[in-house]
Amino acid sequence: MRITNTLTGKKEEFVPLQPGVVRMYVCGPTVYDLIHVGNARPAVVFDVFRRYLEYRGYRVIMVQNFTDIDDKIINKANQLGVDPKMVADTFIAEYWRDAHALGIRPANFHPRTTDFVDDIVEIIEKLVERGYAYQTKTGVYFDVRKFKKYGELSKKRIEDLIAGARVEVDETKNFPLDFSLWKRAKPGEPCWNSPWGEGRPGWHIECTVMSVKILGESFDIHAGGEDLVFPHHENEKAQAEALTGKIFAKYWMHNGMVRFLGDKMSKSTGNIFTVREAVKKYGRDGLRYMILSKHYRSPMDFSEDLLSDYSKAVRRVWEILRRYESNGVTGIPKRNTVYEEYVNRFVEALDDDFNTPVAVSILFELAKNLSKSMEEGDQENALLFYHLIRREFGPVLGLFDLNEERREVAGESLLGILIEVRETLRKEKRYDLSDWIRDRLRENGIILRDTPSGTEYSVE
């Protein structure tokens, strides 16, 4: 297996630190709003990567954090006039609702920043003792010039860097790029006791501490969106390696950004399309298929029209599966040369820097062959193709492996029948019943539109 390591900029053979075990950390959301498709991309990508590692026989220990104290959470709480913890608790619950709808398997650990404050304080103290951090009247900062490998991950030199949009401006700092480890409390903000007075952790130290405490001083994979390479991941790496003197993460994986309406999808700009809306309108597998059809390191353009096309393609596969399952699925296929050929192609694709577009295309090829085998009465191959879709490759990709989409297909079929009944009633001028059907559907979020070419519907 070979993956592109952001640290080296090269495609490298993947060799875990401990044979047979993979320890990985994926940066999770800051919980102050519903997650959008941009947030869904790393969630889906690294959910599937974890599944594939398990398919290949590794035991995976996966950590995905929740940042549950942050300026954005505090600002949201102030806007709503509620406690910041209520904001975080609410949107962690909403995250799980959306993650479940999207078929994201829980990680082994989902730590919250606020559960690790004592550990964070302890590690900041060690960084201060070792000369990598210093105190000012506004808090504690990491001295980037003391860490000689700063910029190694992002390929940036300190001499070329200037304070940018995500670098805190503070005249009390020794150097503009020094970043906050501990923020002195402001009136009305959540705070904790520390040797430097009441305050709260900086953003970057949170992930360093949670990953080191759970996975150890060195682990295999650190992953997230490419927008996190600098400053977040660069700063995480600097803190951890200054603390331990060891390599923090052996491999760094980063997914490309999602572009929507010509720009990066981002909550801070309001340029978003929520996962909840996407799944409700176009289905779980439609969104997962869209994400996996692009190589994880490439940028991904998003639009409703594109998502609609992916959703339609998924529904065609579900219709093939439904036809096969309607006759009752029994038996286990033979492990023949056709089976071996497909497994080899699937593994070859995902072993090559996690090439999900090729892996997904194999799944759709199998669906086409399943349909053809049913038409030809080839029961042996039909069972084999079905098995590979539903029982083997589908569960790795998180596609066609649950029954929720079948219920969606059944729901659409039922809706089509209701529309036909309503059209018949209208032709018979039985408007009381036809209007009753229309109104009941509207109450359930389905809007009917009568056009010259027939009745169309949309989902609110």
From Swiss-Prot:
For this chain, the family text in UniProt reads: Belongs to the class-I aminoacyl-tRNA synthetase family.
Q: Where is this motif: 'KMSKS' region?
A: 264-268
Q: Which organism is it from?
A: Thermotoga neapolitana (strain ATCC 49049 / DSM 4359 / NBRC 107923 / NS-E)
Provide the cofactor list for this protein.
Zn(2+)
Subunit structure of this entry? Monomer.
Subcellular compartments: Cytoplasm
Q: What is this protein called?
A: Cysteine--tRNA ligase
| Cofactor binding, per record | Binds 1 zinc ion per subunit.
Q: What is its EC number?
A: 6.1.1.16
Motif 'HIGH' region is found at: 29-39
